[in-house]
Amino acid sequence: MLKSYLSITKPGIIFGNLISVAAGFFLAAKSEPASLMLFLTTLAGVGLVIASGCVVNNIFDRDIDQKMARTQNRETVKGNINIDVAFVYALAMLLLGTALLFQLVNPLSAVVVLLGYVYYVFFYTMWYKRNSVYGTLVGSISGAVPPLVGYLAVTNFISLEAILLFTMFCLWQMPHSYAIAMFRMQDYREAGIPVLPVKDGIHKAHRHMKAYVVAFGAVSLGLFLLGEAGYEYLAVAAVVCLMWTKVTFRSIDESNYVVWSKSVFKVSLLVVMGISGVLGVELIPLAL
């Protein structure tokens, strides 16, 4: 039973998002005082709110999850979870996570994470994901909130650097998510989810992905140009962005787009891990 309730929080998604929270935190802590306790409290608060959002997503997506091979074995689909209990579970995590951030971090981080939550649950999950080709774009905005909250946990102020970080992660989400949609195209078709590759075809999606990858690379260099990240960051960012660009710009057709999209997806993970990791390695000694 405990395993079932843990699974609907999507631990993998939580872990991935907390890496970006850490990146935002250490980027801000380069020039602002921070502590290990503040760092751990931020991770706990954001992690609980993300877990709550994932549970609500599982609850509301039961009808489409049962149509997709990837999700048809989720506990909420199989009926192993009491939906009323799951709602209470999600609400408890949301309240606890927000309270931790509000009381022990700062009110701004709590407000921003709550706005991201509302955006994800009400705008993305309940409407845009199901009804609009722009669902991925809407989802990318909420997906870029965790690193922003990590940054705000330290600074308690939305600066140009914070906006740049938020923009970076918004741009990263788009080709990453389109790649998933392309190699799981049949699932999305059967569930009736109008993602760009399904609605407008793989070639239009490919053009969009190339544009987003180039934009991400340009924006990611902004942290170095602003003097907020050093040469180690520049080297890693340049390498992973060039790798992502090279893979994304390959020609595709109906015979190879699945293999290609899996490659784009894998490199996208390397990109976010590399950039988040180098920010941590470069800035941890200055932060804590």
UniProtKB/Swiss-Prot annotation:
| Listed pathway(s) | Porphyrin-containing compound metabolism; heme O biosynthesis; heme O from protoheme: step 1/1
Subcellular compartments: Cell inner membrane
Q: What is its EC number?
A: 2.5.1.141
Listed GO biological process terms: heme O biosynthetic process
Tell me the domain of life: Bacteria
This protein's record includes keyword Metal-binding: no
- NCBIfam families, per this entry? cyoE_ctaB, PRK04375.1-1
- What's the protein here called? Protoheme IX farnesyltransferase 2
Q: Which GO terms describe its cellular component?
A: plasma membrane
The membrane-spanning stretches of this chain are: 8-28, 36-56, 85-105, 108-128, 131-151, 152-172, 211-231, 233-252, 267-287
Which Gene3D superfamilies does this UniProt record tie to the protein?
UbiA prenyltransferase
Catalysed reaction, written as an equation:
heme b + (2E,6E)-farnesyl diphosphate + H2O = Fe(II)-heme o + diphosphate
Q: Does the keyword Membrane apply?
A: yes
Q: What does this protein do?
A: Converts heme B (protoheme IX) to heme O by substitution of the vinyl group on carbon 2 of heme B porphyrin ring with a hydroxyethyl farnesyl side group.
Membrane topology recorded in Swiss-Prot or TrEMBL: Multi-pass membrane protein
State any further remark.
Answer: Carbon 2 of the heme B porphyrin ring is defined according to the Fischer nomenclature.
Q: Which UniProt keywords apply?
A: Cell inner membrane, Cell membrane, Heme biosynthesis, Membrane, Transferase, Transmembrane, Transmembrane helix
Q: Which enzyme class? A: transferase
Q: Which organism is it from?
A: Vibrio parahaemolyticus serotype O3:K6 (strain RIMD 2210633)
Please report which protein family the annotation says this sequence is part of.
Belongs to the UbiA prenyltransferase family. Protoheme IX farnesyltransferase subfamily.
Main location per the UniProt record = membrane
GO molecular function terms attached to this record? protoheme IX farnesyltransferase activity
